[in-house]
From Swiss-Prot:
Cited InterPro entries: Class_I_gatase-like, GATASE, GMP_synth_C, GMP_synth_GATase, GMP_synthase, GMPS_ATP_PPase_dom, NAD/GMP_synthase, Rossmann-like_a/b/a_fold
KW Zinc (keyword) present: no
Protein name per Swiss-Prot or TrEMBL: GMP synthase [glutamine-hydrolyzing]
Start and end residues of each Glutamine amidotransferase type-1 domain: 7-197
Top-level lineage group: Bacteria
GO molecular function: ATP binding; GMP synthase activity
Native source species: Bacillus cereus (strain B4264)
Amino acid sequence: MKKQHDTIIVLDFGSQYNQLIARRIREFGVYSELHPHTITAEEIKAMNPKGIIFSGGPNSVYGEGALHCDEKIFELGLPIFGICYGMQLMTQHFGGKVERANHREYGKAVLKVENESKLYANLPEEQVVWMSHGDLVTGLPEGFVVDATSESCPIAGMSNEAKNLYGVQFHPEVRHSEHGNDLIKNFVFGVCGCSEGWNMENFIEVELEKIRETVGDKKVLCALSGGVDSSVVAVLIHKAIGDQLTCIFVDHGLLRKGEAEGVMKTFSEGFHMNVIKVDAKDRFMDKLKGVEDPEQKRKIIGNEFIYVFDDEASKLQGMDFLAQGTLYTDIVESGTATAQTIKSHHNVGGLPEDMQFKLIEPLNTLFKDEVRVLGSELGIPDEIVWRQPFPGPGLGIRVLGEITEEKLEIVRESDAILREEIIKAGLDREIWQYFTALPGMRSVGVMGDERTYDYTVGIRAVTSIDGMTADWARIPWDVLEKISVRIVNEVKHVNRIVYDVTSKPPATIEWE
């Protein structure tokens, strides 16, 4: 029997941070779902949530193409918390004034609490918050009071406690807001009255039921790569429908060292799944020959991947569904109906229009760290659960520019050395993701008294909670030295190593 739990609904107005809001709430043990701003009041009412959060967004509430919501949502009597654009939308709805700011405010600011509403209960009077806005609330709606101010924002927070309506001009969901979690927690528990009750055990129960209802007696193909996401998808679906699942492992020649052999051993022998291995290396390399543009590479790899599945499915009987390990972060990085696109993601951007399968994506409401917890709950070994995140296009987007066998081998061997040394140093759980990339640039060097003109290998290592934001990892110098010396000595055609010290934003984690 499905367990009941309190729910907070988040309405998406296009912020790149909107997924983080739901993520923060789940960290509190309360279920949260993201829905498009076009959802109706009746649909929300049917979900019986305890409260609603309006996300931020890049638009102006008074501008052309401004995003709005069903005005009846304000009549549901539910607590509403507007963040940035969400606060401005609330202001506009209730007759307040929103104007263009003299200067766009982006970055850290000091917030001063002027009125201790429930939102600011037990929080410091001054705190650092993260601002990202071009508009300001300059006139309060009737019945609202100013909760907080900042140097550049006279109305940085407002509330109408009689109606349980709250708004902030900053982003509490971003970790740069030092008490942001506590503020959201105050809304979820203090204002909405939620109770903890959602966890991975609940998620598994709900998803197993959903998979069985969706699939019925039909069959599912799973795109198994051996990475964390596809592994968890495969085990979850196998747990739900058993032998109705067939896993197809496509070796596209863009995998890490030893990965192909490891996948077959773990899933075919260890989990007793039906796994079909397809050697498609030549097919992929032919399609990628001469292609340098990263977006084109992603599309080609995504398309070819599905076509391989089509070919294999035609040999099987009655395959209706294709399972993918799409995550929340995959979707936000590819752009939703409202979010501005950062890059086409390998799981959601490269699908051909004539695809013959219906997609089943049981992880598309989870973040990477949640997927690891789910994997452990499902009994998947740590060496798989804590495996490095690996993109669908594989090493294809870690070789910048045209892909060749020589370049792939350089990345494959250097990446294996990096992983080996990071594990030896005991840093594999501290660093969220680490890999090598080949930027395609050559430089002059000296090896054995001879001049060389060889490739540079870039090392990328980041710390993160959920992949939405990331900081470059402070790997100890002695460990970096070992990695550098080994790669230059053991990998052919490499004479220089560089370390990427850029956070996300402004950079993405992958180089392409």
